[in-house]
Structure formats: structure tokens, C-alpha cells
Amino acid sequence: MQNDDDHKLGKALRPQQNQLPATLATSKKLVQHLKTALAQTGRDLAEDDGWVERLIRGLEAGINENTEIKAVIENKNGEQELNYLPQDKETWLALNRLDFSGEWLYKFSNLKILSAEIGKLHNLQELYLRNNQLTTLPAAIGQLQNLQKLNLRNNQLTTLPAEIGQLHNLQELNLWDNQLTTLPAEIGQLQNLQELLLINNQFTTLPAAIGQLQNLRRINLCDNRLTTLPAEIGQLQNLQELDLVGNQLTTLPAEIGQLQNLRRINLWDNRLTTLPTAIYQLQNLQDLGLGDNQLTTLPAEISQLQNLQELNLRNNQLTTLPAEIGQLQNLGKINLWDNRLTSLPTTISQLQKLRELHLSSNQFTTLPAEIWQLQNLIALNLGSSRLTTLPAEIGQLQNLQELDLSHNQLTTLPAEMGQLHNLYELCLLNNPLRSLPESLKRLYRERNGALKIKLDNPALLDD
């Protein structure tokens, strides 16, 4: 087991081509520098638990494998600190990737201090500092002019230095799981930034400078405290994905409609009572997430989103759908789970590309015949819908693979259920069924285990 641990540690610490010289001698030399550095901080780990010796053995275990160096230095207070580089700096200065992520070195997972020394690594292209306890970044971070990826996920950052704006080659910035309330205006200087992850912070608004990120393709602001978005967000002409789940938005700025390259917008779990009209201008939108809001109507203008492929309206307060929904000819999935629908428009039958239709937890007692014309359906969810009967036309859905009829009032099923030869999952839980049609039982036997039927009384399959 110890040998396995040594090998794993070696994989985390041995040099990578173009990052550190791939020879055992230089690797041992690096270890010696680490020992020297530890001694200079007043803490020598060489004897107390064999960590340095395990490090050397790990390097020997796979010296020829390509991976990156991962290392930290512990200061005399027991805190994890990168405070200076070893005396032989050439090996460090050549690094283009450095990973100090807490999950890799379990012994060193609480890095609290990142000193200005980091700014000397001018060739660095990727820096990973996730899962530590950093509260600030040094201004010297701005000296990493070649940095392309910076990952600071799961730290304790409350602010970013203005010098972050000097990272002109930065393409990906991950600030997920911190305590940020604002971004410096200098963030707008990151002209090559393509991905910005700000999930689970404490933002209530964004700076206007966000609109200067002309190459931004994805921004994720899930689980913050946003009540508004700046109008400047409409300037992000290359934006393709906008994630706003779990905020406090009641509307969107009209400028959202200028995002003509937007493919996906997710507004789950906000406070929308009406659909912002700017949404209808997003002609290239493919995925619209509106679940967990307070929508009571869906306007006819939804039909303008001709490229829409997925529409999620789960857990709102809809009582009807507009007939114009039938004009969404590219729609492949619609989720209407947990609304107040009693019927569907007849135009639903026009959605011939529809593959998934989720209608659970509504107030249906019967279903419109038009559903049975959706020949490409592979998933139909009708759970908790107050159904007392199921029409024979169910047998027309020859491509159906998943059918959920749980939590209804069904006492019988039509014989045509046996025609669903592609079905592999049928949920009938919580229905007062007294028997199953012979055709369904025969289908179950013929599928030889490929069809899973969930029943309160499995004995019904044996009758």
C-alpha cells in the first residue's frame, strides 16, 4: 500500500516535459532545495514523518511519465505558504503550469498565503490554486503576462487586486466558491477572456466594465444575490452561454436582446413573474431555462425563438400554453413539470422533433389526442396528473422508451400498451391497478429483462 501511495505522490510531483528537467538527478536536486527551504522556515520534515523521502521515491517511481509539479512550502506557524523559490530558480522559472490545489496534496491543503514571489514565474501559462484558504492575491499576480488559465475555486477571497486586469492573455478565470461581492473595474481589461466562472459568491450586481469583455463566450453567475444586471451586458457580442440560476432577478435589461450569439440562457430559481420581452430577440437561442420562477403565462411571442431546442418551465404557475408553441419546429424537449395545466393546445402535435415531454404534477384528468401524434417521443412523463384512464392511442408512440404514469388514479391500462416494443422503463407506482393487460405481460416476458416495470404489486406481472 505504501508503494502505491508513493507512486501516486510521484505522479503528482514528478517533472513534465518543458516544465522541469526530466532526470532523476535534477528531481533530487529540487527535493534538496525544498528541504533547504523547509529548514529555513524553521520546520524540517525530513525526519519527522518521512515525507521528503517519500517524495524522492515517488519521483523515482515514474520519472519518465509526463505530469506537472505540485508542491508547497509550510511555514513555521504550520500554515501553507509559497514564500520564495529555491535557490536554483531556473527549473521554476521555466514552468508553464503550476498546481497548488488542495485536493492533490492532502498534507498541504490549506494554502493561506501567496506572496509576490509568484510574479517571477513569467512563463507560467496555467495556475491552479483551488481548494485552499487564500483570502487575498498579491498585486504581483499581474506580472504573469503569459497566464492563460487561473483557477481559484473554493478559497476565501473577498476582493481581487486591480492588477488582475494586467493578465492580458488570460482566457479562463475560475472564481467559483469564494466570498466576492464585487469585481474591480479592471476586469474589463481582460480582452482575451473567454470563460468567467463566478458561481456561489455574494454578488448583488456586476460592474459596467463587464461589457468590455468582447471575447467572452461563457459567464456563470449561479447562486449569487443578483437583483439586476447592468445594461452593458448587451455588449458581449460573442457570448454563447449565460447562467443565472439561483439569484433574485425579477427582470432582465432590454439589452439582453443584443446577444445574438447566445445559445443558452438559464434563469432557473429566480423571481420572474413574466418573461422579459428581450428574450424573444435571441434568434439563435437553443436552450431556455425558466424553471422555479413565478410565471403565470407564456406569451405568444415565444414562437419567435425558431432555433429553440430545449424549453424548461418546470415549477411555475402556468394554467395554459399559447397555441403558438406549435411553431417551435426545432423543439426537442419541453419540461412542464409542476404547473397548473389542465389541457394542452392542439398545436402541440406540430412539434414533430419533440423527443421528451414532461407533464408530471399538473391537473390533467384526460390527455389531448394530439400527444399521440408525436411519433418521435422517446420519453413521456405523466406522473401525478390525476389521470383516471389512458386512451388506446398510447400504442401509437412506437419509439417510446420511458413512460411514467406514477401517482395517478388508473385502475386499468389499455391493451395497446403491448405495442410499445421499444419501451424499457414503465413506472406504474401509486395507482390502484387491479390487473395488467395480457399484451403488456407478454411484452414484458418477450423483452427478457430489458423492460423494467415498477409496480406496487409486482405479482400483477405473474397473473
Regions found by a protein language model. Give the residues of each.
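Aromatic-flanked redox-active Cys/Sec active sites in thiol-based oxidoreductases
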Residues: 131
